[in-house]
């Protein structure tokens, strides 16, 4: 029995809203993967936090070194720990750069952030 092939949508761009950090959330860049769902993330405030990838993200999204993410610091140990809330795609990162929400220096290792 033959199954029909899946149709692929290639017409134009899909318009989606790019999520921005809210409340105490911060932009961050993944610096090192530690294993077991933990990563070291350099945040926009200049601190490096050990961040956990919650199960709802771990099963759906692959997070690599160099990815731009949204980090939510923990209420306790907020300077050292946090949760990764969202990972941006390359297209979304380019949009954030164009709109001036982040700077190229922040992505490449500096701590300069535009707003």
Swiss-Prot record:
The keyword Protein biosynthesis applies. Keywords: Initiation factor, Protein biosynthesis. Gene3D superfamilies: Nucleic acid-binding proteins. InterPro entries: NA-bd_OB-fold, RNA-binding_domain_S1_IF1, TIF_eIF-1A, TIF_eIF-1A_CS. It comes from the Archaea. Pfam families: eIF-1a. Disulfide bonds: none annotated. This is Translation initiation factor 1A.
């Amino acid at each position: 029995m033959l199954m029909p092939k899946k149709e692929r949508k290639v017409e134009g761009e899909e318009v989606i809203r790019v999520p921005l950090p809210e409340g105490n959330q911060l932009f961050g860049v993944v610096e090192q993967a530690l294993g077991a769902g933990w990563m070291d993330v350099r945040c926009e405030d200049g601190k490096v936090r050990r961040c956990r990838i919650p199960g709802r993200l771990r099963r759906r999204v692959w997070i690599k070194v160099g990815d731009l993410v949204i980090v939510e610091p923990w209420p306790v140990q907020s300077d050292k720990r946090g949760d990764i809330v969202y990972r941006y795609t390359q297209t979304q990162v380019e949009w954030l750069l164009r709109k001036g929400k982040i700077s190229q220096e922040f992505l490449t290792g500096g701590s300069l952030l535009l707003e």
